[in-house]
Amino acid sequence: MAVGIGVVGGAIWIGCCRLNLEARLMTALGLSPDWLGQRDGINPFEFFSGSSELYVFLVARFAILVLAVPIAEELMLRGFLMRYVTDASWESLPLGAVGKIGLIAATGYGVLSHPSEWIAAFIWFTLITLLMMRTKRFWDCVVAHSITNGMLGIYILWAHDWRLW
């Protein structure tokens, strides 16, 4: 289930970004899309002069993207924040026992930490929280997160969509 959610989540994130949904919505509402900000993307093929520097960057970037970020973010969100806002005795609260406040906290974190991709973040963070509530397994969230991030990394290199880097 985690693998499937990771793939679906990655496809949704990439699709939302390719369609530029956030900027379109802001424009339709009469607001400037610049208000959302953008990530400072880097094209590693232009930035690094030597091939060894490029390979080191890509290996490090993918290790961070696929291993470090999913573990750290899921520990903070699922291991702490969602349970903390649900119950003062959060250490003893099982993963699947979080309620609406926990769901809102996790999704709110995702939206606030990815403002230029907030629609994708809203959908993705909700999906991963629902996965956690269904399976009650922390590592399912990490696996789904890793797969989504891996898909995003491959997409970024393939499409040269450096704003997502």
Residue ranges and their predicted role:
Residues M1-L19, A23, T27-Q38, F45, ...:
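Interfacial transmembrane-helix boundary/kink motif in multi-pass membrane proteins
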Residues I12, F47-W165:
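Transmembrane helix-loop-helix hairpins at the membrane interface
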